[in-house]
Amino acid sequence: MGGASIWHWIVVGVIVMLLFGRGKVSELMGDVAKGIKAFKKGMADEDQPQAPVVAAPPVTATEPVRTLPPHPTEPAPATHATVDRKVV
């Protein structure tokens, strides 16, 4: 009682097949196999030394940088016309 015999596993397998169907179980196992292969490939790639990264040479400007003239410190004169009104 309490031990997992072969008959227990057969019953569990039959219940899983009835619940999920044959197509879902095989699809799930295929996805698990792909995941294991990807993991192994990633571990193998990690062990290999990687080529050193070569930095690109700095880009130099072909035109000199232009500067803006300084802002005037005095306020500009008013350009709008004033209207003379008579106060009655």
Swiss-Prot record:
GO molecular function: protein transmembrane transporter activity
Coiled coil: none
Superkingdom of the organism of origin: Bacteria
NCBIfam families named among the record's database cross-references: PRK00720.1, tatAE
Entry similarity comment: Belongs to the TatA/E family.
HAMAP family, A to Z: TatA_E (MF_00236)
Protein name as it appears in the record: Sec-independent protein translocase protein TatA
